[in-house]
Amino acid sequence: MQLPQFSELYKSLILIPSISSLEKELDISNKPVIDLLSGWFSELGFSINITSVPETNGKFNLVATYGQGDGGLLLAGHTDTVPFDDDLWTKDPFKLTEKDDKWYGLGTIDMKGFFAFVLEACKNIDLTKLDKPLRILATADEETTMAGARAIAAAQSFRPDYAVIGEPTGMVPVFMHKGHMSEAIRITGRSGHSSDPANGINAIEIMHQVTGQLLQLQRKLKEQYACDHFVIPQPTLNFGHVHGGDSPNRICGSCELHIDMRPIPGVNPDELFMLLNQALLPIIKQWPGAVDVYHLHEPIPAYACNTDSALIKLAEKLTGEAVIPVNYCTEAPFIQQLGCDTIVMGPGSINQAHQPDEYLDLSAIKPTQAIIQKLIEETCKN
């Protein structure tokens, strides 16, 4: 089998739905994408290892390896996309559409299209002349739980020297980002008729106390922690969603608040979760059994790569761009657990990610192909 042309690689990847979602009716297995990539990389002489990701809806990781042993380069990306709003897209999300020097489609830059760039680079390199292994990692569920990357980190089955995650950065190398925590605070009171407030326990009134404590915690985070690489240097705490009660004439029996916290490098998510619980301790003591604090999903740690890394110096040389920090999250903290220097760098703009009519600007194709090819040659040859 001869590998398709670059545009056909892209078209085939976009054609296959691979949405991940916490809503079961939207969640789709990524196996067809994994099988497609497996066939293509096999054709190039890579050995293939496909593993199921535990506790997922039929999700799989793929590791394609050319060469033996540890070291070398890992090029990593995720096979899933976010869901899409059919009413807002003006083009078919699963059909690669060319218009105004752009390729439109779901996953063009976030980030199935990255694998087409990697395949094209591998086609143009004499892989038999590489001295160190080249690995390609395709993961699952990055857009939800990061279960695929977590499984790879837990397995510790290989150890590259360097890793590049091809998320859309405009090919500007990223060396740092904050983490992400989604936490829930549930208040369980006692409902009753609103004509006799003393005959119940109003969960909204307790939640009012909770928000007061959390506002104090916001100030504490700003005063005690800082990473000056970020425009907003402190760990943040955002009030994202609140719901309580069902009728004006009932004492509210339950109320739930969802918050977002963003740890900075050097601050463990467990530390922030402990501070959250400490802030709420007076209320927990005042209302025994009424306050429940729990993770909506497992936290994602912050990430930072040492700026003295040879990988950073190489990426800056190849792109002509200095490394930057970003505010969004990637799989970098989990890939980094393999023991390798890790950066995030890929084609496309983050401004198009998770947006209707997601697109890749065609002017980025040739420069990106050249950079990825040179990156492989520089890291996998002595």
From Swiss-Prot:
Biological process terms from the Gene Ontology for this record are:
L-arginine biosynthetic process
Main enzyme class: hydrolase
Q: Give the gene name.
A: argE
Q: What pathway does the UniProt record associate with this protein?
A: Amino-acid biosynthesis; L-arginine biosynthesis; L-ornithine from N(2)-acetyl-L-ornithine (linear): step 1/1
Stored PANTHER family: ACETYLORNITHINE DEACETYLASE (PTHR43808:SF1)
Location comes to:
Cytoplasm
Family under the similarity heading: Belongs to the peptidase M20A family. ArgE subfamily.
A Gene Ontology cellular-component term: cytoplasm
Q: Quaternary structure?
A: Homodimer.
Q: What is its main location?
A: cytoplasm
Q: Tell me which residues this entry annotates as catalytic.
A: 80, 142
Q: What species is given as this protein's source?
A: Moritella abyssi
Query: The organism sits in which domain of life?
Result: Bacteria
Keyword Zinc applies:
yes
Q: Could you identify this protein by its name?
A: Acetylornithine deacetylase
Task: Report the catalytic activity.
Answer: N(2)-acetyl-L-ornithine + H2O = L-ornithine + acetate
Q: Which Pfam families match?
A: M20_dimer, Peptidase_M20
Which parts of the sequence bind Zn(2+) 1? Answer: 78, 110, 167
The protein's matches in CDD domains, at most eight in alphabetical order, are given as:
M20_ArgE (cd03894)
Keyword line: Amino-acid biosynthesis, Arginine biosynthesis, Cobalt, Cytoplasm, Hydrolase, Metal-binding, Zinc
